[in-house]
């Protein structure tokens, strides 16, 4: 995989990304606590027929992590567009966002000056307005600093159990350990501020204005963002298709249902 020179955007921040292949531009954007690393398999797979790009949001992965930023999702969408412009100019893209990345993708698609770049949208395990009873019980303690999101025990138990189905955890212990290690490398301030931004995001009333074709992907056992949220998006987004991956598939569909995920995305791309 080609690790390209880091892009510098207007504020002087350096943004990391990975890229491989030629053809239509597929841009993958990761979720909360993630990085481009979570799409390495997809970059390899889709680069056979497409130009596949995965970007580290500001504050994530190998990108700069300035403490001066609020890390609200609207800003991350604008930074994302600036990075895309530096990489591919004015070319069109298909934007594929997972979890928080899917929320950013919806903001992108409902912001006219940004949306004009889109050929299509893939919304993966995401929501226009976040709610989760498990998170609701602890969010005040997290936001006040009583609970450290990046405490190793919290990551290994609560976060991993929200991200992955138990069956997958048992089948892939080495991968789960690597996922924990990568998560613990996350900047604590960024983790907290993006957590707050996810909680504050509400674009439910805007997604009816998405005009490009949209593929909505969810799974039957996602306990981080519930399948019902995807069903709601399907109702609201005019030109959209919903696929629920099963059986016993958790939040990270690109891992737990890799082959079905690849097929669903490929089948969608050839129709737009």
Model feature map: region roles:
Residues 1-26, 48-51, 88-89, 116, ...:
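Alpha/beta-hydrolase fold catalytic core
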Residues 10, 53-100, 107, 259-263:
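Active-site loop/oxyanion-hole signature of alpha/beta-hydrolase fold enzymes
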Residues 13-65:
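Conserved HGGG/HGGXW glycine-rich cap/lid loop of the alpha/beta-hydrolase fold
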Residues 106-111, 117-150:
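Flexible "cap/lid" loop of the alpha/beta hydrolase fold
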Residues 132-134, 152-208:
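Conserved alpha/beta-hydrolase catalytic His-Asp/Glu region
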Residues 210, 216-218, 222:
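Short beta-strand/loop motif that positions the catalytic acidic residue
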Residues 223-229:
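Conserved alpha/beta-hydrolase "acid-adjacent" motif
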Residues 249-262:
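Catalytic histidine-centered segment of alpha/beta-hydrolase-like enzymes
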């Amino acid at each position: 995989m080609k690790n390209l020179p880091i892009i510098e955007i207007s504020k002087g921040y350096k943004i990391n990304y990975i890229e491989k292949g030629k053809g239509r531009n597929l841009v993958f954007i990761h979720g909360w606590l993630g990085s481009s690393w979570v799409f390495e398999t997809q970059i390899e797979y889709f680069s056979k027929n497409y130009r596949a790009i995965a970007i580290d949001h500001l504050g994530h992965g190998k990108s700069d992590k300035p403490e001066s930023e609020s890390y609200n999702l609207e800003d991350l969408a604008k930074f994302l567009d600036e990075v895309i412009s530096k990489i591919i100019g004015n070319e069109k893209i298909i934007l594929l966002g997972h979890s928080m990345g899917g929320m950013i993708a919806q903001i992108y698609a409902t912001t006219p000056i940004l949306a004009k770049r889109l050929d299509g949208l893939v919304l993966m395990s995401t929501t226009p307005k976040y709610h989760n009873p498990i998170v609701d019980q602890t969010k005040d303690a997290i936001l006040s600093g009583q609970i450290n999101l990046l405490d190793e025990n919290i990551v290994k138990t609560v976060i991993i159990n929200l991200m992955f189905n138990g069956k997958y955890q048992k089948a892939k212990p080495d991968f789960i350990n690597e996922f924990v290690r990568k998560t613990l490398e996350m900047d604590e301030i960024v983790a907290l501020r993006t957590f707050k931004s996810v909680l504050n995001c509400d674009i439910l009333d805007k997604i009816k204005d998405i005009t490009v074709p949209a593929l909505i992907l969810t799974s039957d056992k996602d306990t981080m963002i519930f399948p019902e949220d995807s069903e709601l998006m399907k109702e609201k987004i005019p030109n959209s298709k919903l696929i629920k991956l099963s059986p016993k598939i958790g939040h990270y569909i690109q891992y737990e249902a890799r082959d079905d995920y690849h097929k669903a995305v490929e089948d969608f791309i050839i129709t737009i």
